[in-house]
Amino acid sequence: MDFALTEEHLMIRNAARDFARQECLPGVIERDEQQRFPLEQVMKLADLGFLGMMIPENHGGAGLDTTSYVIAMEEISKVDASVSVCMSVNNSLVNWGLEKYGNEEQKQRYLKPLAMGKKDGRLYIGAFLLSEPEAGSDATSQHTTAID
């Protein structure tokens, strides 16, 4: 079995590494100490296509494989945990569920802008929240109702 990275994987790694060093590293300590959301950095993640890496192109994503996603996450996580968590939640918790279980209308309405990271020129990202009193941090024990 060949575990060597492909040329595409190496390009993703270099792009993620450059982004982390040039865009995330400057100010990372200040953002963390001031508890500031890394808005500028997450907007640039969207520009790079890193907010919908494994989502097919017809749904606004980059259509890349899981290895590409993991490589990019590793490079960004080395420098800025806040930016990498935004990337992780959007890609794996939010987009994955919509891609796997959403109908076509939901994919067009929600998944496409989430995978692109923008809607009408504004940041558009998903979130994951544990706030149910009976569940605590046990997500499988939550009970909720969706309202559109």
Residue ranges and their predicted role:
Residues 24-148:
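Glycine-rich flavin
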